[in-house]
Amino acid sequence: MATKQAATQKGTKAYTTPRSFGGFQIPITMQSTNLRTYCEKKGLVFHLHVVENQIPNTYLVLESLVEKANSYDGIVMCSVSMLPNEPMIRKSIVTRILDQGCKLHFTFEQIVVSSLEDLTELEELVSLVALSTSQQMPTNSLDQIPL
């Protein structure tokens, strides 16, 4: 039964980045392992990862993946923080993926975006993540205590 189901699936393409995201700098191999494990647990057919360019604020590989989204059931990445920071660009990418019948999976947040309604929730989550990472945490250093 699982073999027949796997044969009808287009599969899930993994997207990784060498850049830091959401305050993390995670090696590509660890990202790929995380994505593969997620797909195995969810019963998704895993396709090897693609790697984004190192150049900051460019998404050439992601854009290429968007153009081929109809070839997959889903695209999986570690975090919503891997998407472009610019809301209009992010919304355009996600909408074009959804329009091709493809879902977006985010393993750290454990969410799947499969509809425009989910896009609204995704935008709220991205706003919260951006807010939380922009806040400076107070330091409790003994060096700062006057003697």
Q: PLM features: residue spans?
A:
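Short, structured surface patches at the beginning of a domain
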Residues: 1-147
